[in-house]
């Protein structure tokens, strides 16, 4: 089933999602006992969060009839930049830090999303690899 949304819909959905990521970055860390499992899950969520952001950015740029290369480049640049902006913002939140490893996970999620989109042929318009 193909979802057909207008430019404004994709833009709004993407902006709201980006604000959700920012909101989650602004939440102070509650002082809890060091728990490796909780931290691993929390850090692992960076990958799917940025995979979804990249997917939304791709769909937004597709709605504006951009070229495939331009779509992929801008989606990567914006997603990776948003991750870095969020890491910097986090450094000002009590109990939170700016983490290079989190940004690496954000970039991994971004890259995986672009690879999956290409493999699933959303980005290529059904023409394959």
Model-identified regions with their sequence ranges:
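Membrane-helix interface segments
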Residues: 6-10, 31, 64-74, 96-100
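Short helix-capping/hinge motifs at transmembrane helix termini and TM-loop junctions
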Residues: 27-28, 62, 94, 121
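Interfacial helix-loop-helix junctions of multi-pass membrane proteins
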Residues: 33-39, 83-107
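Membrane-interfacial alpha-helical segments at the cytosolic side of multi-pass membrane proteins
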Residues: 49-64, 110-121
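Membrane-embedded catalytic cores of phosphoryl/pyrophosphoryl-handling enzymes
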Residues: 57-64, 69-90
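Membrane-interface capping segments at transmembrane-helix boundaries
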Residues: 119-129
């Amino acid at each position: 089933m193909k979802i057909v949304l207008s430019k404004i819909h994709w833009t709004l959905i993407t902006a709201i999602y980006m604000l959700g990521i920012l909101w989650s970055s602004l939440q102070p860390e509650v002082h809890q006992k060091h728990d490796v499992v909780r931290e691993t899950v929390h850090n692992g969520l960076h990958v799917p969060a940025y995979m979804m952001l990249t997917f939304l950015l791709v769909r937004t740029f597709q709605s504006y009839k951009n070229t495939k290369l331009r779509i992929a480049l801008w989606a990567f640049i914006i997603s990776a930049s948003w991750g870095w902006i969020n890491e910097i913002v986090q450094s000002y939140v009590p109990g939170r830090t700016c983490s290079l490893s989190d940004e690496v996970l954000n970039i991994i999620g971004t890259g995986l999303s672009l690879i999956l989109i290409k493999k699933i042929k959303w980005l290529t318009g059904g023409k394959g690899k």
